[in-house]
């Protein structure tokens, strides 16, 4: 069981936590502030409104047309290829920063990674996934 000592330290069996009072206070306050603000907003909000609350709000104007518009699949293909190469950049940046310290094995691993992505790009290009027409 935990007990407080006279020198403001919390003792859990063998472990003594000394000087963590500020951290405990910070955690307590940072937990209470969002809980209290959400509770206050729930208590002070206006009552529920009628059917106009369920309508779509679009820049203060009545919405024109339906919300479900079909996009051409080409947009998705370009977005998918972009995301793949964007993730490649995210993975290669730390490798490039630490290139001098990593050695030959890391170079070979990065080369294999880039080769797999280039093969995927060639496959998408050959299948016509990058053609706009």
Curated annotation (Swiss-Prot):
It is found in: Cellular thylakoid membrane. It catalyses: a plastoquinone + NADH + (n+1) H(+)(in) = a plastoquinol + NAD(+) + n H(+)(out); a plastoquinone + NADPH + (n+1) H(+)(in) = a plastoquinol + NADP(+) + n H(+)(out). Pfam families: Oxidored_q4. It comes from the Bacteria. It is an enzyme of class 7 (translocase). Its main location: membrane. The chain crosses the membrane at residues 12-32, 77-97, 102-122. Belongs to the complex I subunit 3 family. NDH-1 can be composed of about 15 different subunits; different subcomplexes with different compositions have been identified which probably have different functions. This is NAD(P)H-quinone oxidoreductase subunit 3. It comes from Synechococcus elongatus (strain ATCC 33912 / PCC 7942 / FACHB-805) (Anacystis nidulans R2). The lineage of its organism: Bacteria, Bacillati, Cyanobacteriota, Cyanophyceae, Synechococcales.
